[in-house]
């Protein structure tokens, strides 16, 4: 699933190419693409037609288009393989095209989704701590690249939990936008094993992890995000290349860039974690062991 840098790359592309345009028509080509919009396809198409796209916004991994003159946003769920492509209408239809919106600018906004886990849905905007967000996103915490992200407050929240530090990083109600890739990269930079317990880490250590997450995601942004296959692309269909700069994630058995020790892969929350056993020694007591 795309993480903050990948979603931000898409947001910036949408901001550049479609903000200010109005929607002339909408074609729903697959029912699963609008399953989160409970009133159905005709309602979604009807509400979008004639609306002007005022802005492209994001919080963490969540992306939405603010519409005018209403107080409604089009929430875009990218899922595992969703793509928001801006294309000239004469280009051939993509094999997995699910929704097509024709804009008055002469361009198409196309939602392509091979695995059909993503989709579009309308949601009312609500005020949360001085920011307007879709009500479906209201429970999501600010992300590390948000100008109003409160690092000190987030450190306090993390340390107030009794859980593994990686699990806390992945909790979108604590800090949003960080997924498996950037959690592993941030922990590697901070030299902390993901199974370390949050209430046993010092404030400076938690701050170091969160700062590392900020740094690695900013670097990923400059390289268009991380693409491991053709499913993640920007609005022009181009892949990112930060995967070439990863130090831990996906690097099993390769030498740690810092000390040369082979990177190790471990199971964590039905996924894999990657770390250096020398730079990031595992804790003697994990959460599972301490609860026995």
UniProtKB/Swiss-Prot annotation:
Disulfide bonds: none annotated. Its cofactor is Zn(2+). It holds the Pfam family zf-FPG_IleRS. DNA binds at residues 96, 115, 161. It catalyses: Hydrolysis of DNA containing ring-opened 7-methylguanine residues, releasing 2,6-diamino-4-hydroxy-5-(N-methyl)formamidopyrimidine; 2'-deoxyribonucleotide-(2'-deoxyribose 5'-phosphate)-2'-deoxyribonucleotide-DNA = a 3'-end 2'-deoxyribonucleotide-(2,3-dehydro-2,3-deoxyribose 5'-phosphate)-DNA + a 5'-end 5'-phospho-2'-deoxyribonucleoside-DNA + H(+). GO terms for molecular function: 8-oxo-7,8-dihydroguanine DNA N-glycosylase activity; class I DNA-(apurinic or apyrimidinic site) endonuclease activity; damaged DNA binding; zinc ion binding. GO terms for biological process: base-excision repair. The active site is at 2 (schiff-base intermediate with dna), 3 (proton donor), 61 (proton donor), 271 (proton donor). InterPro entries: DNA_glyclase/AP_lyase_DNA-bd (IPR015886), Formamido-pyr_DNA_Glyclase (IPR020629), FPG_cat (IPR012319), MutM-like_N-ter (IPR035937), Ribosomal_uS13-like_H2TH (IPR010979), Znf_DNA_glyclase/AP_lyase (IPR000214), Znf_FPG/IleRS (IPR010663). Keywords: DNA damage, DNA repair, DNA-binding, Glycosidase, Hydrolase, Lyase, Metal-binding, Multifunctional enzyme, Zinc, Zinc-finger. A zinc finger (FPG-type) spans 247-281. Its EC number is 3.2.2.23, 4.2.99.18. Binds 1 zinc ion per subunit. SUPFAM superfamilies: Glucocorticoid receptor-like (DNA-binding domain) (SSF57716), N-terminal domain of MutM-like DNA repair proteins (SSF81624), S13-like H2TH domain (SSF46946). Coiled coil: none annotated. NCBIfam families: fpg, PRK01103.1. Belongs to the FPG family. Involved in base excision repair of DNA damaged by oxidation or by mutagenic agents. Acts as a DNA glycosylase that recognizes and removes damaged bases. Has a preference for oxidized purines, such as 7,8-dihydro-8-oxoguanine (8-oxoG). Has AP (apurinic/apyrimidinic) lyase activity and introduces nicks in the DNA strand. Cleaves the DNA backbone by beta-delta elimination to generate a single-strand break at the site of the removed base with both 3'- and 5'-phosphates. HAMAP family: Fapy_DNA_glycosyl. This is Formamidopyrimidine-DNA glycosylase. It comes from Rhodococcus jostii (strain RHA1). The lineage of its organism: Bacteria, Bacillati, Actinomycetota, Actinomycetes, Mycobacteriales.
């Amino acid at each position: 699933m795309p993480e903050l840098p990948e979603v931000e790359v898409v947001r910036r592309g949408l901001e550049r190419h479609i903000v200010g345009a109005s929607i002339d028509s909408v074609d729903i080509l697959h029912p699963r693409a609008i399953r989160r919009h409970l009133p159905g396809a005709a309602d979604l198409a009807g509400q979008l037609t004639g609306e002007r796209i005022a802005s492209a916004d994001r919080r963490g991994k969540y992306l939405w288009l603010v519409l005018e003159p209403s107080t409604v946003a089009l929430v875009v769920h990218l899922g595992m393989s969703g793509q928001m492509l801006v294309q000239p209408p004469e280009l051939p239809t993509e094999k997995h095209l699910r929704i097509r919106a024709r804009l008055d600018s002469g361009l198409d906004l196309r939602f392509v989704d091979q695995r059909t886990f993503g989709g579009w849905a309308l949601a009312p905007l609500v005020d949360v701590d001085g920011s307007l967000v879709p009500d479906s996103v209201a429970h999501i915490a600010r992300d590390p690249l948000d100008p109003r992200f409160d690092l000190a407050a987030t450190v306090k929240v993390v340390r107030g939990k009794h859980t593994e530090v990686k699990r806390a990083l992945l909790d979108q109600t604590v800090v949003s936008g960080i997924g498996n890739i950037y959690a592993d990269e941030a922990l590697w930079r901070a030299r902390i094993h993901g199974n370390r317990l949050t209430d046993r880490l010092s404030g400076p250590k938690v701050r170091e992890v969160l700062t590392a997450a900020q740094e690695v995601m900013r670097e990923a942004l400059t390289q268009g995000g991380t693409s491991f296959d053709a499913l993640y692309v920007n609005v022009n269909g181009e892949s990112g290349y930060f995967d070439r700069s990863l130090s831990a994630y996906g690097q099993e058995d390769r030498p740690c860039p810092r000390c040369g020790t082979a990177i190790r892969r471990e199971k964590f929350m039905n996924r894999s974690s990657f770390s250096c056993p020398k730079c990031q020694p595992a804790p003697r007591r994990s959460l599972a062991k301490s609860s026995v």
